[in-house]
Amino acid sequence: QDWLTFQKKHITNTRDVDCDNIMSTNLFHCKDKNTFIYSRPEPVKAICKGIIASKNVLTTSEFYLSDCNVTSRPCKYKLKKSTNKFCVTCENQAPVHFVGVGSC
């Protein structure tokens, strides 16, 4: 995965993510869970500043997060909002994989 794909999968301009709609798209294929970061792309990319080789990094500050968790098949989800730190895999000074919430 690359930075552009990471942005499409994890960065949003709304806290009220329409989970049922977005998770049914070809980008997600009804996967069990996805976390969205409510932010402009620049602050998220800055997490990886100076990191070239693949490395997991925990944010130093908290972000608004929106989790879409599957509740039933096919493609029915519940939205859970939170504020927390998160961990990403950085490569070539950009996030390429969302590792998890709270810790690496």
From Swiss-Prot:
Keyword Nuclease attributed: yes
Pfam families hit by this protein: RnaseA
Family statement: Belongs to the pancreatic ribonuclease family.
Binding positions for substrate per the UniProt entry: 31-35
Function in brief: Basic protein with antiproliferative/cytotoxic activity against several tumor cell lines in vitro, as well as antitumor in vivo. It exhibits a ribonuclease-like activity against high molecular weight ribosomal RNA.
Keywords: Disulfide bond, Endonuclease, Hydrolase, Nuclease, Pyrrolidone carboxylic acid
Name of the top EC class for this enzyme: hydrolase
Name this protein carries in UniProt: Protein P-30
Classification via InterPro entries: RNaseA, RNaseA-like_dom_sf, RNaseA_AS, RNaseA_domain
Pyrrolidone carboxylic acid found at: 1
Disulphide-bonded residues: 19-68, 30-75, 48-90, 87-104
GO function term, MF aspect, one: endonuclease activity
